[in-house]
């Protein structure tokens, strides 16, 4: 057969998206909440003398060293009383708040909240329609507990083929900076702002997603901001806070969570002891060969290597434990991955302690993340159905083992060159127990968050189903809903709008639209479970996974060409 005939028989290249996914996102400057005033020097000394009566005596030095260190106050709660004037459409001081009779003026909306609101693009009509939702998102957005999540491995290598893998795959060691929205720590840990400077290396060739699409974490709120009506104005109408599904058991849950968090503090030695009980004994350099560096991050390095015994290509993450601010998270993630192996999950293979470094061996998927395919190519319904089916199989497995992933999005779906689809990044996963069947911590990535997470209500495994529905829209439109909105307004829209509207719903089949509606049902009880959705007719039109391979290759080519 001639070469010309071969050329004619080649299938057409997969369609590419015309719009670029490289968007600028300007970080918002947030005013930090003021620190509590330091006690007066005189009172401070008197208090110290009462605690350490022999403080100046040298003979007591040994005893002083043995005494426990008195820590600074923590977990300050600054209660803000805000009302809403339905006539003027303005947030006002709460004139009947707890400060009346104290001689202090009521606070009203804090100045930094007012500034955020002015630049949020939330209209006056929207504020008037649902003022409590506005306060909810302001409270979250300005929370001192909100910390930015720079994924553990940020790609800085010249090997563009590794970009999706490194960008998507993390083992909970997060770096901190301060962009518009941001994240993670552990639900079992006190949140601290980690201030690590970014590596002074050249930026990656491929522009990353906007900062505000990164995962976020904020801790549970025991008493959310309550919206009260001003009492002295006849023109104002009371606004009742949205129900939080709170009862005595929920209050107990919050208190128990705080207690567990305090108890969970581990010393470095305890962490090392725990790691020694988890990792394998031996020298990994004798088990693996052909190490090739594919990624470098502030907290460690990622290599590919070959298992000498099996010939399997693996990814090895080498982390310096001294540089990990939240070592407990690493233990948690390893334990979850080790106990939950599945064909649709990027599986944990092994781990080793090598000097001061922890080496974690994982499956390696050379196809990169689904994000590359979503942003660079156009997927048809059969291909989307195939991806959804594989993800639902992973979620059904996790949910049946009482694990919520809490950060489902295209960045956390890795692809093999054969079209295999696997879920990764268990840094935010939560274990459900009979004592704690619901969670309330705001975790995930804003644009993929379920409404019940944004409003900080108790939630369960179905938050993953909502995020899967948003990811399905991502596969259709190349981005999640509200991505071009101001992040604060996006949170408001998620909390109030319900199921997001599609740009061109008429282009989708009826069964696909029904599948999306089942995933994106506001009523959690009516939202489909992973097990139920695996029986949905939409999944019956799924194409073979091998149909994803041309898209993966096309995405890699598009990325390669854009970097020239």
UniProtKB/Swiss-Prot annotation:
Expression induction or repression: Up-regulated by the proneural transcription factors Neurog2, Neurod1 and Ebf3. Down-regulated by the Notch pathway.
Polar residues bias spans: 18-29, 234-255
Region (GTPase-binding): 65-123
Pfam name, any one: Pkinase
Positions of the UniProt region annotated as Linker: 84-287
Top-level taxon: Eukaryota
Residue intervals of the Protein kinase domain: 288-539
Protein name according to UniProt: Serine/threonine-protein kinase PAK 3
Organism of this sequence: Xenopus laevis (African clawed frog)
């Amino acid at each position: 057969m001639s070469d010309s005939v071969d050329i004619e028989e080649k299938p057409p290249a997969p369609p590419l998206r015309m719009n670029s996914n490289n968007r600028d996102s300007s970080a918002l400057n947030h005013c930090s909440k003021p620190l509590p005033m330091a006690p007066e020097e005189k009172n401070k000394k008197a208090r110290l003398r009462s605690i350490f009566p022999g403080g100046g005596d040298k003979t007591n030095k040994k005893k002083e060293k043995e005494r426990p260190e008195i820590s600074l106050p923590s977990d300050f709660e600054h209660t803000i009383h805000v009302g809403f004037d339905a006539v003027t459409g303005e947030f006002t001081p709460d004139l009947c708040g707890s400060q009346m009779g104290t001689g202090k003026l009521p606070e009203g909306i804090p100045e930094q909240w007012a500034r955020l609101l002015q630049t949020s693009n939330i209209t006056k009509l929207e504020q008037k329609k649902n003022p409590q939702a506005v306060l909810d998102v302001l409270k979250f957005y300005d929370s001192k507990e909100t910390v930015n999540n720079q994924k553990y491995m940020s790609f800085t290598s010249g090997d563009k083929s590794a970009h999706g893998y490194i960008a998507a795959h993390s083992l909970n060691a997060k770096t901190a900076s301060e962009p518009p929205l941001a994240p993670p720590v552990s639900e079992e840990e006190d949140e601290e702002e980690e201030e690590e400077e970014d590596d002074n290396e050249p930026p990656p060739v491929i522009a990353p997603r906007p900062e505000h699409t990164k995962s976020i974490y904020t801790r549970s709120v025991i008493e959310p901001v309550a919206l009260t009506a001003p009492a002295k104005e006849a023109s104002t109408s009371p606004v009742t806070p949205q129900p939080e599904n709170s009862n005595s058991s929920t209050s107990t849950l919050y208190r128990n969570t705080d207690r567990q968090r305090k108890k969970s503090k581990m010393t470095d030695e305890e962490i090392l002891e725990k790691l020694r009980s988890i990792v394998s004994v031996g020298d990994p350099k004798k088990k693996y060969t052909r190490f090739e560096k594919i990624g470098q991050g502030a907290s460690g390095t990622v290599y590919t290597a070959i298992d000498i015994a099996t010939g399997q290509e693996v990814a090895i993450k080498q982390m310096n434990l001294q540089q990990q601010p939240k070592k407990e998270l690493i233990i948690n993630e390893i334990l979850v991955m080790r106990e939950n192996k599945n064909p649709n999950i990027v599986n944990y293979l092994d781990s080793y302690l090598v000097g001061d470094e922890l080496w974690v061996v994982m499956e390696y998927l050379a196809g990169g993340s689904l994000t590359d395919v979503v942003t660079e190519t156009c997927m048809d319904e059969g291909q989307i159905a195939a991806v959804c089916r594989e993800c639902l199989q992973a979620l059904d497995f996790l949910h049946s083992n009482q694990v919520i992933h809490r950060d489902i999005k295209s960045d956390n779906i890795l692809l093999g060159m054969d079209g295999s689809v696997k879920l990764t990044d268990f840094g935010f996963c939560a274990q459900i127990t009979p004592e704690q069947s619901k969670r309330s911590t705001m975790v995930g990535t804003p644009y993929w968050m379920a409404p019940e997470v944004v409003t900080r209500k108790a939630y369960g495994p179905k938050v993953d189903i909502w995020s899967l529905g948003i990811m399905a829209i991502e596969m259709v439109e190349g981005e999640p809903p509200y991505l071009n909105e101001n992040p604060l307004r996006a949170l408001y829209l998620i909390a109030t709008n319900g199921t997001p509207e599609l740009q061109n719903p008429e282009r989708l089949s009826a069964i696909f639209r029904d599948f999306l509606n089942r995933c994106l049902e506001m009523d959690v009880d009516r939202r489909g479970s992973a097990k139920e959705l695996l029986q949905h007719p939409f999944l019956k039109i799924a194409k073979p996974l091998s149909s994803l391979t041309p898209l993966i290759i096309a995405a890699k080519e598009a990325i390669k060409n854009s970097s020239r």
